[in-house]
Amino acid sequence: MKQIKWGILGTGSIAKAFAEALQETEGELIAVASTTKQRALEFSEPYGCEAIEGHRNLISLPGIDAIYIATPHTSHFEFAVECLKQKKAVLCEKPMTINATETMALIDLSRKNKTLLMEAFMYKIHPQTQKLAELVALRLSLIHI
């Protein structure tokens, strides 16, 4: 299997959790971008990856296969569009966008460019979701949540 080369947009706590988890995979963190060079440097140091000022500079960086978007949610759509246009796979923190129209536009662009688009949605393994699935499987007529 090909090793996935990652870039991370954002340097907050969720981006750090992703970078830590990435260390346990065969993926490689190539670069991280923040609004300031200093913030990117502080984040990148433990991972030995490149620190980039400006999110768009990371998106255009050659050699990156996939980008994890962990910026404020109002910027997700804009950054995801740029990534998909450059045929870079996108793993976007939730919510992927702030409305259904933007989400459908991303899905359409992803399909057009044959590029992966995925929301970082962890609720499939959440205990409440598993319990709900169990109850639905039992065909209970009334479910209270």
Tell me the role of every PLM-derived stretch.
Residues M1-Y47:
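N-terminal Rossmann-like dinucleotide-binding module
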Residues A66, P72-H73, F77-M122:
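Beta-strand-loop-alpha-helix segment that lines the small-molecule cofactor/substrate pocket
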Residues C49-H55:
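Conserved SAM-binding strand-loop segment of SAM-dependent methyltransferases
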Residues L29, I64-I67, L140-S141:
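Local beta-strand N-terminus motif with an aromatic residue
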Residues D108-L116, Q130-S141:
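Basic phosphate/pyrophosphate-binding loop/patch that engages nucleotide-derived ligands
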Residues H55-P62:
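Short amphipathic alpha-helix with an adjacent loop that forms part of the alpha/beta core around
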Residues I143-I145:
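Conserved small/polar residues in nucleotide/adenosyl-binding loops
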